Amino acid sequence: MFETTLHDGVLELAAPGARWLSTGWNGGDTRADRAYSITVPDDWAPDSTHEYVTDRLAAAGFAPRDDAPVLLTGVAQEHARIARCGPVAVAATAGLSNPAALPMDPDGGTLPDAKRAPPGTVNLVAATTRALDDAALSNLVAVAAEAKAATLLATAGFPGTTSDAVVVACDPGGETAPYSGSATPVGAATRACVREAVRASLDSRDAASPDSVESAAHGTTTDVQAAVFRP
């Protein structure tokens, strides 16, 4: 699990000796004692993300570490919520100003331009006290993302936003868990925690969720059609 400290728009999630896997900025597999969630302004467009992160952490009283996973979000940290279940805890910041829709009857659009998306608005940090191998830790990212998509579809009608990110962590010294799928204690606990934390974060916000991509401040609809063929 992790211990939390919140100051000046930065949430520290401390888990000494943890192994992390991040899909966010400067992500990948790392060993670190903590991870961070940083709220950025709406007009955020730094020349150097690394310098920005370093400065924000220092200004908030935290010691910047290059090995620490960092998530960036437009959601204020006052809306962060943490859920615990069994061997898992999940921290979530959730907002839907930039929904990403995936219609099942696409009308044949085009691929979007490659450009900077708004900072992630549904971010998750999932940590377990179990020790996971490479495969189980990687699979936990998929489990968390699946639970996030199911929760958002049921709550808001969208599976995600244009810039969501997931960080997962395990305790290398904990009890070994060979698998992390949805039918395992780790996977099931993660799914429950994601559901509760995401809904609680959304419920903490005064702003209503958009009912369509068109009514959102930002967003995208994947209406391009892919070609299907037999191998």
From Swiss-Prot:
Its EC number is 3.5.1.90. It is an enzyme of class 3 (hydrolase). Pathway: Cofactor biosynthesis; dicyanocobinamide salvage pathway. Residues 200-231 are annotated as: Disordered. GO terms for molecular function: adenosylcobinamide hydrolase activity. The keyword Membrane does not apply. InterPro entries: AdoCbi_amidolase, CbiZ. Keywords: Hydrolase. It catalyses: adenosylcob(III)inamide + H2O = (R)-1-aminopropan-2-ol + adenosylcob(III)yrate. It holds the Pfam family CbiZ. The keyword Hydrolase applies. Belongs to the CbiZ family. Converts adenosylcobinamide (AdoCbi) to adenosylcobyric acid (AdoCby), an intermediate of the de novo coenzyme B12 biosynthetic route. This is Adenosylcobinamide amidohydrolase.
